[in-house]
């Protein structure tokens, strides 16, 4: 099984990328993990065209058999333990999973329509780059929960 986080944009500030990279490295001990970034539609920012362009880029990165899970503010809110259980179910199915994170304008309707699941990382509205860090950390935490390791206390 492989889990991929497919996200719009890069961390140009350098604030989050080191932590995301560290958790991605740690995840590699448990499963195949990949972070895929697609470009932001900067010229169209704030317009309906931005969502469409970014959505098309996200969809183009998906494999035909990947389970698609989107991060969405209206998605299921899970505890870390419940998220670990969700990851366990994905692993039991043996299906690759793509977790999609939209840009600052959100996700295009076409992307939401392709989603098999929707997850919320918080009730707070988070910068999408911060949401990426939270998601990757929670994936790592889920793996340690499933293995009974002491990271999650």
Swiss-Prot record:
Binding site for S-adenosyl-L-methionine: 71, 102
Subcellular location, record wording: Cytoplasm
Keywords: Cytoplasm, Methyltransferase, rRNA processing, S-adenosyl-L-methionine, Transferase
Signal peptide: none
CDD domains for the chain: RlmH-like
InterPro entries the record matches: Alpha/beta_knot_MTases, RlmH-like, tRNA_m1G_MTases_N
GO terms under cellular component: cytoplasm
Keyword Transmembrane on entry: no
Pfam families, alphabetized: SPOUT_MTase
Family matches, as Gene3D superfamilies: 3.40.1280.10
Record-listed E.C. numbers: 2.1.1.177
GO molecular function annotations of the record: rRNA (pseudouridine-N3-)-methyltransferase activity
This protein's record includes keyword Nucleus: no
Catalytically driven reaction(s): pseudouridine(1915) in 23S rRNA + S-adenosyl-L-methionine = N(3)-methylpseudouridine(1915) in 23S rRNA + S-adenosyl-L-homocysteine + H(+)
Stated family: Belongs to the RNA methyltransferase RlmH family.
Assembly and interaction partners: Homodimer.
Function recorded in the entry: Specifically methylates the pseudouridine at position 1915 (m3Psi1915) in 23S rRNA.
PANTHER family assigned to the protein according to its UniProt record, in alphabetical order: METHYLTRANSFERASE, RIBOSOMAL RNA LARGE SUBUNIT METHYLTRANSFERASE H
Protein name per Swiss-Prot or TrEMBL: Ribosomal RNA large subunit methyltransferase H
Organism listed in the record: Anaeromyxobacter dehalogenans (strain 2CP-C)
